[in-house]
């Protein structure tokens, strides 16, 4: 009888332990194709390795939030950290600046990573 109580208790304690673990997200901003001014492309923000799962991700154009953005489903790795991909269509040019802004419990303020057209 004690064994039937100990196993579920161990599982519950393990789940609570996972919530206590915090890992900051790694943020990568890149385009699907090499940047070519005036040619349609996709801007991607890949956020990975974070825990817990609550996260806010915005793609920015000249510091303002881009409204038409899609994203993958929240997924997790073998180590129980999470990852997501946010993306939108865009047409690069010389004057506009693009970035990805991420808010997560591990950051005291949101972190913004700029798109480097040469990457």
UniProtKB/Swiss-Prot annotation:
Gene3D superfamilies according to UniProt: Immunoglobulins
Record keyword Protein biosynthesis present: no
Signal sequence residues: 1-20
Any one Gene Ontology cellular component term annotated for this protein: MHC class I protein complex
Domain of life: Eukaryota
Biological process according to GO: antigen processing and presentation of peptide antigen via MHC class I; immune response
Occurrences of domain Ig-like C1-type (ranges): 25-114
Intracellular or extracellular location(s): Secreted
Main location: secreted
InterPro entries per the UniProt record, alphabetical: B2Microglobulin, Ig-like_dom, Ig-like_dom_sf, Ig-like_fold, Ig/MHC_CS, Ig_C1-set, MHC/Immunoglobulin
Keywords carried by this UniProt record: Disulfide bond, Immunity, Immunoglobulin domain, MHC I, Secreted, Signal
Disulfide bond entries: 45-100
Known partners and oligomeric status: Heterodimer of an alpha chain and a beta chain. Beta-2-microglobulin is the beta-chain of major histocompatibility complex class I molecules.
Biological function: Component of the class I major histocompatibility complex (MHC). Involved in the presentation of peptide antigens to the immune system.
Family label: Belongs to the beta-2-microglobulin family.
Protein name: Beta-2-microglobulin
Native organism taxonomy: Eukaryota, Metazoa, Chordata, Craniata, Vertebrata
Originating gene: B2M
């Amino acid at each position: 009888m004690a064994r039937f109580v100990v196993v579920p208790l161990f599982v519950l304690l393990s789940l609570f332990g996972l919530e206590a673990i915090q890992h900051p997200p790694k943020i990568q901003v890149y385009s699907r194709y090499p940047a070519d001014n005036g040619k349609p492309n996709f801007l991607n923000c890949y956020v990975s390795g974070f825990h817990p799962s609550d996260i806010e991700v915005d793609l920015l154009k000249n510091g303002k939030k881009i409204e038409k953005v899609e994203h993958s489903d929240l997924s997790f790795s073998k180590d129980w950290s999470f990852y997501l991909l946010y993306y939108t269509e865009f047409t690069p040019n010389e004057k506009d600046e693009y970035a990805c802004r991420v808010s997560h419990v591990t950051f005291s303020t949101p972190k913004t990573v700029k798109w480097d057209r040469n990457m």
